[in-house]
Amino acid sequence: MMKRDTKEQIAQEIAEKFQKSQGFYFTEFQGLDVQKMSQLRLEFRKAGIEYRVVKNTLIKKALKDAADVDKLAAGLKNTTAVAFAYDDPIAPAKIIKKFSKDNEALKFKMASIDGQVFGSDSLPQLSEMLSKTENIGRLAGLLNNMVASVPMVMNAVMRNLVSVIDQVGKLEK
């Protein structure tokens, strides 16, 4: 049994992780064997995501100052592991969805991304979203296409203007 000081320290540490992360995901892992759990942790680690098993009571203590503490606390039943996403808040959803296809013991409970809470039924939508990096790349591509098309549009306008002037000149003769 953990001492009270140790519990307080862990709750404080988890609270800091909640604040530092752009998003966090609660999962239930009951029934996953050690090998599968290690494989899942490795997938998360490759993506720069911290995955940690935490007691529900410690999570509740860590969330006591959160805006949606009631919604988040409602999902804390059975065993809980938390995936903390510091860089890409969508990456855990993709990993959880992919991993849970082959491992039904892993269940998505809920997530909080930039302060918005998502329930257990929202994993498919979350996993289909583009990451911030992918969105920036698409935006950069769109802007690049727009900038590249400006000279073409200007040339077309000039050609049309010259053509109109030429036609007007022919009509006057």
Curated annotation (Swiss-Prot):
InterPro entries in the cross-refs = Ribosomal_uL10, Ribosomal_uL10-like_sf, Ribosomal_uL10_bac, Ribosomal_uL10_bac_type, Ribosomal_uL10_CS_bac
Q: Which SUPFAM superfamilies match?
A: Ribosomal protein L10-like (SSF160369)
**Keyword Ribonucleoprotein among record annotations:** yes
Q: Could you list this entry's UniProt keywords, alphabetically sorted.
A: Ribonucleoprotein, Ribosomal protein, RNA-binding, rRNA-binding
Gene Ontology CC entries for this record: large ribosomal subunit
Molecular-function GO term, any one: large ribosomal subunit rRNA binding
Q: Which residues form the signal peptide?
A: none
Question: What Gene3D superfamilies does the record point to?
Answer: 3.30.70.1730, 6.10.250.290
> Would you identify the family this protein belongs to, as annotated?
Belongs to the universal ribosomal protein uL10 family.
Name the NCBIfam families on file: PRK00099.1-1
State its role.
Forms part of the ribosomal stalk, playing a central role in the interaction of the ribosome with GTP-bound translation factors.
Q: Could you identify this protein by its name?
A: Large ribosomal subunit protein uL10
Organism per entry: Chlorobaculum tepidum (strain ATCC 49652 / DSM 12025 / NBRC 103806 / TLS) (Chlorobium tepidum)
Q: List the gene name.
A: rplJ
